[in-house]
Amino acid sequence: MFLEVETHCHTIASGHAYNTLEEMVAEAKNKGLKGICITDHGPEMPGSCSSLYFYNLVVVPRKIDGIMVFRGCEANIIDYEGSVDLPESALNRLDFVIASLHDVCIPPGTILDHTRALISAIKNPNILCIGHPGNPLYEIDKEAVVKTAKEHNKAIEINNASFYVREKSRENCIEILKLCKKYGVYIAMGSDAHFKTDIARCDVTRKLIEEYEFPHELIVNKSLENFLEFLRLHGKNIE
């Protein structure tokens, strides 16, 4: 397996995914992973769960059948100031928060709007990763976003599902990957799995990483130790 930790996947709690948390963990084990982040959509996503779900993730065992389970969220950015749909009191209970722009939660604006939103989200200490920034619906100043991620030791996601469900994402993702290499910025390889068989699917992302010779030490989920070290950078000491 090219990566050891899945950093972006959804359960039935998201409202439009099809497996339980335990089924996702079991599939991660079947695929030889060592860890999985459960990153269900925040409450502004139609059909998703309430903030109480995220507060209560602390009851989920840290290990299930030998697989480390990280408590996460794909929070929805809900304005162009970078606010997300969970209070800080919920965010700071989680291990790995992704912030993303979704058109059902915020309408596309200008490049300046989108860039301001992502930069502001990056500056939030409880947000560790920007989700699918290659989405062509939300064009951004890629260099400004990547440089801000560098300043704050945050990760930029290269979202494998984008190559299949977000038309014209490829060119944006390649440019973002090149900029992350240029500036030494962390990336996360997210499958964005909404069904268990897609866990750890990174076929296109892996090809691009190999083609552009992206440093493996900057891939936060390449190994479990990489991921734990990335979390430690942000004050999260998980054993």
From Swiss-Prot:
Its EC number is 3.1.3.-. Zn(2+) 2 binds at H16, H41, H194. It holds the Pfam family PHP. GO terms for cellular component: cytosol. Binds 3 Zn(2+) ions per subunit. The keyword Ribonucleoprotein does not apply. Coiled coil: none annotated. InterPro entries: Phosphatase_YcdX_put, PHP_dom, PHP_phosphatase, Pol/His_phosphatase_N, Pol/histidinol_Pase-like. Belongs to the PHP family. This is Probable phosphatase Csac_1188. The lineage of its organism: Bacteria, Bacillati, Bacillota, Bacillota incertae sedis, Caldicellulosiruptorales.
